[in-house]
């Protein structure tokens, strides 16, 4: 009993893994916000190209968040727009407008794990995860970095195919509940992508925005970096911004 009792007490004090993931998600969703984004894609050989993006987001009741993303530069992607409806407890919805085709189409579930505009980020990385799509468990507590280390596994094969990985390991700060790193494993259980959070922008409502993050593809040695600038929170955003019609303007 000497060893068992302390272990039981530690387990009782440890928050449920799904609750930690849910809290981390909720802290990253603010009332309204606009910003510019630089997306830089670096090839294995060192050459790089950048995309300039504008983003406006607004949150609603029950964890619903809507986001409009518009590509400004370079010329070959200018006018491309995305509408993201980020649901907390149900499937996210995404649409993309392609100016060359003058057509808006819905990004279907099977495309969620595919590349976001040829970067190392996936379409799913552009949304907050639906907590119920995964089972979550603690792997260990890292005393050195003061982190929760949580493994998230898709609840079934369909969800695994949808997200494009067999499991994800998240490193979350214990004191602030902020995700600091994510590791993604393929269907052969091999680590193939790492996303690291480089900096956080604190918001006035006690929440936060991931200001700078980098995705490294271990298979291709490509790297993609997202950096936010000109961040304005609490902006007045009309609901008409988040419509198919606005995508095509």
Please give the residue ranges for each predicted region:
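Short amphipathic beta-strand and strand-loop transition segments with alternating hydrophobic
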Residues: 55-58, 135-142, 198-200
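Gly/Pro-enriched, hydrophobic low-complexity segments
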Residues: 83-85, 93-96, 103-107, 112-129, ...
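Boundary of Sec targeting at the N-terminus
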Residues: 11-13
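Long terminal segments
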Residues: 244-249
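A short, amphipathic edge element
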Residues: 18, 49-51, 126-139, 189-194
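N-terminal mature ectodomain segment of secretory-pathway/periplasmic proteins
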Residues: 15-100
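Bacterial N-terminal signal peptides
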Residues: 1-6
